[in-house]
Amino acid sequence: MAVSVLRLMVVLGLSALILTCRADDNPNENDNPDSKPDDSSKNPEPGFPKFLSILGSEIIENAVDFILRSMSRGSSFMELEGDPGQQPSKVTS
């Protein structure tokens, strides 16, 4: 299940990153303005690409934190307390 969550986070992070990069691109200069419909009634929001950029960076930061936490949890069971040559003491209740 952790692998599927990791894959999902990577896909979401990459798609957000791609969307933010594509949102900043200028339209092609070769396009004929007469072929485009008149969208003068629409008001583009200038803050929308900034929102996507923040969202993408948050997703990437969360993915990196998740990976680092899972790596640290996976290696913590290998740490030994005391001398490795000693037998572990048995705990009785």
From Swiss-Prot:
Entry annotated with the keyword rRNA processing: no
Sequence ranges of Basic and acidic residues compositional bias: 33-42
Pfam families registered for this protein in UniProt: DUF4576
Cell compartment(s), UniProt: Secreted
Keywords: Secreted, Signal
Entry's Gene Ontology cellular component terms: extracellular region
Name of this chain's protein: Uncharacterized protein C5orf46 homolog
